[in-house]
Each structure stands twice: as C-alpha cells, then as structure tokens.
C-alpha cells in the first residue's frame, strides 16, 4: 500500500507474470479479444475523459486500501471469496476503455460496500486473534536503552516483533491503532 520503489514493484510484477504463465500457460499467445494477454497501460487512465478518469481513480484507490485490509486479515487466516472476486471485477472495470459512467458508477458504489465487508473481516480477524480493544493508559516516557519504533497497522508484525525481542532489553514503541 505504501511501497513506491520502482525496483521492488518491477520484481512483484515479474512474480505475478511468472505465476500467470504457470496458471494459464496459453494466455500470452491467445488471440481472444478479452485483452488479458497484454499488460494494462496505466497512462491511458490519466488521459481519458475527466469524469471517467475520476470514477476509475475512485475504484483504483478504493481497492488499493481494501487490498491492505484483506492482506492483514488473510495473514491471520481470514479470507472472504466475495472480497477476492471483487478485486478482479474492479480491475476489469478499470481496464475497460469503452465503459461509461453508467457502468462505472455502480462499481464505485460497490467498492464502498465490499470495503465495508473487508473492514468487518479485518475486525473479526483482529478481535478473534488479539481480543477486543479497550481504552488503556500507556506511558509516554522513553526508556533508556535500545529501541524499535513500529508503525502502521499490521498487528501480526507487532506480535512477532514483541516475541522476538522478549527479555532482550529492547523497548518497542508504537502509536495509533497498534496500541
């Protein structure tokens, strides 16, 4: 959700391409008009009609945040096929060059609906795994010695970090929803 390093993104894209070749070996040589054999040129998204660009941007940025929620839930063993399938539907809509407002607006609204389900799933995963959060007073002092600052919202990473540093004299600091 926050990685904008070109080299890292290229490695991820290459990994996706390799997986696609294994799952659907003939896709790249297929002459079907679906267009799934080509990479999507993102620059076309930013040069289209302003209203269409706005709707597709809402879809794109909506599923981008939703993907982070879905990932964190899946790390804790919680998935929902409806959410997974919607990513394909949303990406397909973004890639459709001839879709107008009449087809894109319902997808934008569906992003909100599916995103709500995704947040419910993440809440279920977090509360089942870690318990229901309660207001708690925490010290705001900085202790002497080595420390690690962890930020974000991946509670599993925080759990693993706490386990790895237990009884080693390393202080862990965080903020916001990690508390």
Predicted segment positions?
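Metallocofactor- and cofactor-centric catalytic cores in central/energy metabolism, strongly enriched
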Residues: 1-179
């Amino acid at each position: 959700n926050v990685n904008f390093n070109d080299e890292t993104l290229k490695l991820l894209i290459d990994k996706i391409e390799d997986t696609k070749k294994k799952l659907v070996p003939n896709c790249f040589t297929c002459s079907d008009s679906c267009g799934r054999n080509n990479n999507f040129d993102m620059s076309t998204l930013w040069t289209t009609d302003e209203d269409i660009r706005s709707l597709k941007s809402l879809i794109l940025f909506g599923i981008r945040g939703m993907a982070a929620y879905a990932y964190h839930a899946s790390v804790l063993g919680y998935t929902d096929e409806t959410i997974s399938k919607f990513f394909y539907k949303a990406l397909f809509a973004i890639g459709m060059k001839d879709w107008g407002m009449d087809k894109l607006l319902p997808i934008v609204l569906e992003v909100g609906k599916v995103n709500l389900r995704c947040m419910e799933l993440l809440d279920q995963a977090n509360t089942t795994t870690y318990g229901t959060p309660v207001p708690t007073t925490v010290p705001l002092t900085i202790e002497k010695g080595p420390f690690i600052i962890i930020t974000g919202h991946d509670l599993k990473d925080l759990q693993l970090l706490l386990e790895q540093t237990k009884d080693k004299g390393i202080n862990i600091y965080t903020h916001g929803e990690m508390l």
